[in-house]
Amino acid sequence: MKRTFIMVLDSFGIGASADAKKFGDEGADTLGHIAEACARGEANVGRSGPLTLPNLSRLGLGKAAEESTGTFPVGLDKNADIIGAYGYASELSSGKDTPSGHWEIAGVPVLFDWGYFSDVENSFPQELLDKLVKRANLSGYLGNCHSSGTVILDQLGEEHMKTGKPIFYTSADSVFQIACHEETFGLDRLYELCEIAREELTDGGYNIGRVIARPFIGDKPGHFQRTGNRHDLAVEPPAPTMLKKLVDEKGGEVVSIGKIADIYAQVGITQKVKATGLDALFDATIEEMKKAGDNTIVFTNFVDFDSSYGHRRDVAGYAAALELFDRRLPELMALIKEDDILILTADHGCDPTWPGTDHTREHIPVLVYGPKVKPGSLGHRETFADIGQTVAAYFGLSPMDYGKNML
């Protein structure tokens, strides 16, 4: 019975890539800088002391990071008994965004340039805004700028509730984000507005990767909270991913947990499971692993590392989340059967010590575990697509155009 379980620790980079300077990210290191902050006692909110990741260390995380940066992460166990194959991968794709990273993991790197809204203020073309106002029958809009999602809620949330005007904002990523109050504006209306925005962006040739619905609740600044009803409207990958090939060539199952289905625009996904928060995502993953049959991929995105801690530059929160993930990892590993493969990886970096609020261009860890996986170094992988090629080979699928089998 062949089953693969892919866990993406969203934004968990392990050191700047060779081309990081081009992105303004030279020297970024999500894992390394979190570990250093913990060792200095600068991440003692909700946790304390050095970063402690014994289970990830046994899978080779520390050694993969050392291969990536030349420095072993402080606090991690240098003498851990290695039980998995480990390495680090560079990104071939042109961006450092979520779709690019995930598509490349699935064997389809993004070799074109996304469109971006690069102006920090008045970010969106007036023609686009006018069409959205007209088609969605809006009284106007707020924002129209670059912002962190939580900051803009405190700035404009109250005005949005009073006026009913949606909050439009973007970032350094190829995104058009719309924040609206679940109760005063309505979730269905927000989703409809996002569908209209997706159509207008596509028809207008803007080449924007995602429209993201950002629903929130609360009644005043400091009390606004984003809910778990986020919805991403992505464009489809430009070629068949290994997910789609498993479904088409083997009649296999691909179970999406968290935002995976949205990232791949639902293509190559046979089941969707919604869950919000690290523990809930873990619980859902464990349940689906227990049920998984032959020719199945269970694919989970642990978004909180990125959305709750990376972008918000919350070092202590990121460290605590990593330690929670590590504590729960044995539950997951206990479900691995004779022919199974477990892959732990990331899609980009988001160094919480780095200036700004955006992603960072970094290597990702590639940790592979299973009874038939030989422990040891996989070295430097030149593309995330090595993961997709490895999975394709494991299931006996037609080869991907990019990547090399690691096993």
Curated annotation (Swiss-Prot):
Belongs to the phosphopentomutase family. Binds 2 manganese ions. This is Phosphopentomutase. It is found in: Cytoplasm. CDD domains: PPM. Keywords: Cytoplasm, Isomerase, Manganese, Metal-binding. The keyword Zinc-finger does not apply. Isomerase that catalyzes the conversion of deoxy-ribose 1-phosphate (dRib-1-P) and ribose 1-phosphate (Rib-1-P) to deoxy-ribose 5-phosphate (dRib-5-P) and ribose 5-phosphate (Rib-5-P), respectively. The lineage of its organism: Bacteria, Pseudomonadati, Pseudomonadota, Gammaproteobacteria, Enterobacterales. PANTHER family: PHOSPHOPENTOMUTASE. Mn(2+) 2 binds at D306, H311, H359. Its EC number is 5.4.2.7. Pathway: Carbohydrate degradation; 2-deoxy-D-ribose 1-phosphate degradation; D-glyceraldehyde 3-phosphate and acetaldehyde from 2-deoxy-alpha-D-ribose 1-phosphate: step 1/2. Its cofactor is Mn(2+). InterPro entries: Alkaline_phosphatase_core_sf, DeoB, Metalloenzyme, Phosphopentomutase_DeoB_cap_sf. Mn(2+) 1 binds at D10, D347, H348. GO terms for molecular function: magnesium ion binding; manganese ion binding; phosphopentomutase activity. It catalyses: 2-deoxy-alpha-D-ribose 1-phosphate = 2-deoxy-D-ribose 5-phosphate; alpha-D-ribose 1-phosphate = D-ribose 5-phosphate.
